[in-house]
Amino acid sequence: MVTMAIKNFHIQDDRLKNGRGNKTMSESDYNTSDSGGWVLVRKKRDRSTRPPDVVDRWSNSTSTFPMGLDQIKIKRNGCVNTY
């Protein structure tokens, strides 16, 4: 479990794109929040694993990420950091 205080971000499974669970998103496909906010993306899953639910936005709070979050990519103003 990862806990982090952060504002205005989206969390997405990186296999979810156009409703297709088997297509991986590229960094240019990330949907940022307003004002170039943070984007958090789950690690790509095995195709046999059902993609986890998407949490659209959390803000202004210390948030605990859902179980099964193996890798986080945070994109802020064009820079991507992986944790």
Curated annotation (Swiss-Prot):
Residues 21-35 have a biased composition (Polar residues). Residues 15-36 are annotated as: Disordered. It comes from the Viruses. This is Uncharacterized protein 040R. It comes from Invertebrate iridescent virus 3. The lineage of its organism: Viruses, Varidnaviria, Bamfordvirae, Nucleocytoviricota, Megaviricetes.
